[in-house]
Amino acid sequence: MKKEELKKKLSPLAYRVTQENGTEARFTNEFDDFFEKGLYVDIVSGEPLFTSLDKYQSGCGWPAFTQPIDKKVVKEKRDKSLFMERTEVRSSNADSHLGHVFTDGPLDKGGLRYCINSAALRFIPFDQLESEGYGDYIKYFS
């Protein structure tokens, strides 16, 4: 999708986050304190990224997940911006900036914390997976 089409499709915040590597404000975003059962997809492409089963309250101010739905749906890049070194997380299909992954997550779940911007995500409630075209993902919740 071309930049001009994306500017029309996305909110200004979602565009800034996904296309310009922005970061939304902590503790004031849509999914930080949201724990309904369902699927989180890339707001740009609709690619499934995370499930609510892997979401947890990390206290960081952004949605946190222990793992993506499949390692292939995200790619990681070294990020040396803001005078620090981090690992950026991007969606594989649309190359959307999602957030960062850190090694301070729950040890019993692998030790990773995927710290993701709400503005990069669209939530599909479990009871709407079939009607929204994500019926194949119901199996993840059984």
Swiss-Prot record:
SUPFAM superfamilies: Mss4-like
GO BP annotations, alphabetical order: protein repair; response to oxidative stress
Record bears the keyword Oxidoreductase: yes
Catalytic residues identified in the record: C115 (nucleophile)
Catalytic activity field: L-methionyl-[protein] + [thioredoxin]-disulfide + H2O = L-methionyl-(R)-S-oxide-[protein] + [thioredoxin]-dithiol
Recorded coiled-coil stretches: none
Transmembrane segments annotated in the record for this chain: none
A single MF term (Gene Ontology): peptide-methionine (R)-S-oxide reductase activity
A GO CC annotation given for this chain: cytoplasm
UniProt entry keywords in alphabetical sequence: Oxidoreductase
Keyword Secreted: no
Domain MsrB: from-to ranges: 3-126
Superkingdom, taxonomy of origin: Bacteria
EC number: 1.8.4.12
One Pfam family this sequence matches: SelR
Similarity comment: family membership: Belongs to the MsrB Met sulfoxide reductase family.
Name of the protein in question: Peptide methionine sulfoxide reductase MsrB
